[in-house]
Amino acid sequence: MRIPRSMTSWLSMLLAGGLVALGGQGAALAASGASRPAAAAQLACSEAELGQAPAGANAKPMVIPTLRDWTGGNGTLSFDAGSRILVDPTDAAALADTATQFQAQLKTVSGLALPIVSRAATPAAGDIVLSLAPCGASAAQLGEEGYSLDLEDHAVLRAKGAAGVFYATQTLLQMLSLDGAAAGAHLRVARGFAVDVPRYAERSIMFDVGRKYASVDFLAAYLRFMGWYKLNTLHLHLNDQAKAKDGSWGLRAFRLKSDKPEFAGLVPADGLVYTRDDWDKLETIAAAHHVRIVPEFDTPGHAGAFAAANPAIAYVGDTPPGGTIDPTKPATLQYVESVFGEFLPWFRSSTVHIGGDEVNVNSGSITTASQVDYLNQLGRFLQSRHRRVEMWGDASYLPRLDKSFIIQRWINWGSEASINWADKGYQWTESYGDWYIVPFGPSYFNPDGIKGDTLYAKWSQATGANAPSGGQIAVWNDNALLDSYTWERKVNDLLKDAVPAAGQVFWRGQEHDAQGQTVDYGVLRRSVATLQYGPDVTRFSDSPIPAR
């Protein structure tokens, strides 16, 4: 029998062994059976959180990504119109946005419009508690994004930071969504205790918006979609060029627009740009879903937009001409630093990407040494502005390249395909070419998209010293002018199936059963068929993620 809410508050105080200290008026309220007290001490740790609760019968919920550790309880925890979202008062400011976001998502999933209570209050049956005070052995394991989830008479979501609490809310919402009830009326979850931490620090999707502009609304939808599956980085490749059918540069584009006249030449011929207001909107949505936006200005190669805006720094050895800027000219570094300096105040991410790939070195005036010197100097400029530097890897840059740079490995041929950048002293992210999508491109760049089953089965299972610190799947638009297609239809259709799988392999890796056998992705796909794009995305309602 479920104990009435009016009684649960007082019983929980007694059972917690001093969770709430009562005196004077509080003691009188307790004796009379009146409403909850106005003050409570810090929420006590439960037996499950301290590792002292016996395991029950409930199976591990098949949320995506799957949980690292699960101790099943018995029975279910239900929420109703009397439930509340309780925020530990000491964490009220830090968790205000997370609580509000969760409140809105929970209403979509369950139909419940629950109040947020940030004053001290004792949890009653069916309440949901958000706290930045982790318990027991899990406290040392959680890092910046991990969390614990205790589901008994009420739900307690704990983490060391707001990101971890957000991810705990996404897990709880997914558990609700998988309860078998009608859409918008999910009210029950299995009881149990989970501890969950990510495999990779960087869990990324990259969009080439330089060659093909993506609307703000499309990017906003993907930020929400990514947060649902615990992906935390949207890498935007903001400048590039695309060839016309005659082989010339039909488009050379940089997608950010400054109001200053000295940067007017960077506005592309198609006029499709992101203004400061556009960028601020995306950053706000990203923050709500704990996704960071990493901007990339790719130079000295892929820099046709910079060459068009400032012809004096163009490299003359290109075919076709006008796609590269000359790293040997002092004016080149000065100009690129000025562009970064103009837009750095827009960016909330501590990391910026400087490109650095595919330059026609060792011909004309450009050598490998001059390329590396340019990249090192640009990187030091950005570091002086308190930014971390990320770039595309190239083994020819060794050993001169600054070891503080984060490397994205992308080359999937020859000896470089297996290079371990950690052995060379670098933090690195796996961005292997096998996980590119190039619409209308060659077969080895997945022109028909990436299936979640393939990504799940074939992504590297390396651990320890051989493992990267992050993973990324990418959409490149090399053929933007050769075929007519849109982000909303073509690109989403090619990418959508891989997004939940990317969340799985970047956060958890492959799932294994009790016997240590790899769980087939088809089992996880059954959950994806229900979870879809998440409670915040309606844009792709006519393009569901397939059930098989």
Task: Cite the ranges covered by each PLM segment.
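Bacterial N-terminal signal peptides
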Residues: 11-23
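Conserved, mostly hydrophobic/aromatic
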Residues: 85, 106, 161, 205, ...
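Feature activates predominantly on carbohydrate-active enzymes
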Residues: 142-323, 331-333, 341-351, 477-479
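Bacterial N-terminal signal peptides that target proteins for export
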Residues: 1-13
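Flexible, acidic glycine-rich loops studded with aromatic residues
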Residues: 401, 413-548
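Hydrophobic faces of well-ordered beta-strands that scaffold small-molecule active sites
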Residues: 203-207, 234-236, 293-297, 352-354, ...
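Active-site neighborhood of glycoside hydrolase catalytic domains
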Residues: 306, 311-406, 411-425
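Acidic, contiguous N-terminal accessory segments
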Residues: 31, 36-195, 389-396, 403-405, ...
